[in-house]
Amino acid sequence: MTTSKDTTKVHKPWTEVVTEKRALRDARIDKHLKSDIKFPSDGISFETVDIDVLTSLLRDRKVSAVEVIHAHSRACEAQKQTNCLTEICFDDALEQATQLDEFQQEHGQLMGPLHGVPVTVKDQFNIRGLDSTLGYVAKAFSPAESDAPLVQTLKKLGAVIIAKTNLPQSIMWCETNNPLWGLTTHPEDPKLTPGGSSGGEAAMLLMGASIIGWGTDIGGSIRIPCHMNGLWGLKPSSGRLSYRGVEVTLEGQQHIPSAVGPMARSLSCLKLVTKLAIEAEPWAIDPQLPPVPWRDGIFQATSTRPLSVFRDLVTKLEAAGHEVIEWDSSLNSSIIDIMDGYYSADGGEDIRSAVSAGGEPFIPQIQAFVNRGEPISVFEYWQLNKRKIAIQEAYHDMWDNKRSPTSRPVDVLLVPTMPHTAVPHGSCRWTGYTKIFNLLDYTALTFPAGKAPRGENDGSFWEHVPRNEVDAWNQRLYDPVTMGGRHVGLQIVGRRFEEEKVPIVLKPKCIF
């Protein structure tokens, strides 16, 4: 981390900072939960409303933007149940909603395609006047001076940001816990994790307290919580959406760039906000982005071409006329090894210095993360980069050369997201299914594939001989009773900059 405020010394005991930050957040929530103002929309359920339905209600004046935002601020009772929020901006949200209603009254139309749509963003996204802490105590009470470009774009489109959501200490873990904001729990069972690192977003969406969430993904941080909560989540290729104004741990590393992406309860919402964000031409304000516009129609043929898939969906896919071929995963272990080398390249210095600046303890998983290895030399780093490029080329060539029995090329891959459903807090250990596509920088979308069957004990699972310690750990986690009925998500993976293509593959007529 390079800016002075990242290393600001906290002179108060860290516990006092935590108490003050949480009290400020809770007061801002309670102000609205205790409001005795009644609106017609109080009786409207927004849990299943998508953007098109909501904007139609707004356009027909069956509900106002103020009513919608008021209803969703009330819905943030989700915080009381799951501890999913960090920063609260209900007052600003209601002020913006009032302006939207006034615009509609004056002009007879909505301000934009996201007019009045309640949105939450992960704690990393800068919003003027609010902290972006990354779960670090030292970053508390250091408000951002301006909105991140993506936040600016969302507001111009009419969206209303209502809150920021929790993440793990440093963001570098697949659960959601930190000493500053505390532990976020799964909406359906407080003993379980909602995943991470965008776990606060997932909890808000599952509880219907937000319609669109925005997260980040450097190893599965969008896809894992979506898998555990029955949601849709897109990890674009890095450089498709702007990361400018989004705080991040390990700032300055370019070997595995983190990606910004949306999370939603429906595919239609996910595709719409991705399209709108790209059509806003983010490269005009972020020099790190290539000018790749949204390409409607370029991948329409995808829906009639073969899919490379596995396991449970094979029968459905074949019945729908798709060719099913087995994918070669032999490169995956090397990709994971390279990723792990990058994660520990600085010997944990970045995270260690950020935690020591605040004085708080490490959560156990991050303590283990920073102790994974010693810092490497510049020469060793170059060798790691050479390995990355070589494996990217090998994977590219393998994809190009793979053919179906009728000699058709592969469109996309169907891949697991995690080796288990939502599990007890502190149990997640392996993210290999997701992070391989961060190193490859491929587009990956997690979608709700169903729920684990209830009361079925698959004896063959216990006959499996674990390949290593982590495999044995995951096997011990398996419980057919507690995992029954839990959400299961799978990944559809395309190649670089195929954000338009991946959603098309998931149209109901194509797979389900």
UniProtKB/Swiss-Prot annotation:
Annotated residues for binding of substrate: 197, 218-221
Catalytic activity: a monocarboxylic acid amide + H2O = a monocarboxylate + NH4(+)
Enzyme Commission numbers on file: 3.5.1.4
Keyword terms: Hydrolase
Listed Gene3D superfamilies: Amidase signature (AS) domain
Pathway: Xenobiotic degradation
One Gene Ontology term of the molecular function aspect: hydrolase activity
Entry-linked Pfam families: Amidase
Active site: 122 (charge relay system), 197 (charge relay system), 221 (acyl-ester intermediate)
Induction / repression: Expression is not induced in response to 2-benzoxazolinone (BOA) exposure.
Membrane-crossing segments per the record: none
Misc: Fusarium verticillioides possesses 2 unlinked loci, FDB1 and FDB2, necessary for detoxification of antimicrobial compounds produced by maize, including 2-benzoxazolinone (BOA). The FDB2 cluster arose as a duplication of the FDB1 cluster with rearrangement and expansion by incorporating additional genes.
Function in brief: Amidase; part of the Fusarium detoxification of benzoxazolinone cluster 2 (FDB2) involved in the degradation of benzoxazolinones produced by the host plant. Maize, wheat, and rye produce the 2 benzoxazinone phytoanticipins 2,4-dihy-droxy-7-methoxy-1,4-benzoxazin-3-one (DIMBOA) and 2,4-dihydroxy-1,4-benzoxazin-3-one (DIBOA) that, due to their inherent instability once released, spontaneously degrade to the more stable corresponding benzoxazolinones, 6-methoxy-2-benzoxazolinone (MBOA) and 2-benzoxazolinone (BOA), respectively.
Family: Belongs to the amidase family.
Name of the molecule in the record: Amidase 2
Organism: Gibberella moniliformis (strain M3125 / FGSC 7600) (Maize ear and stalk rot fungus)
Gene this protein is translated from: AMD2
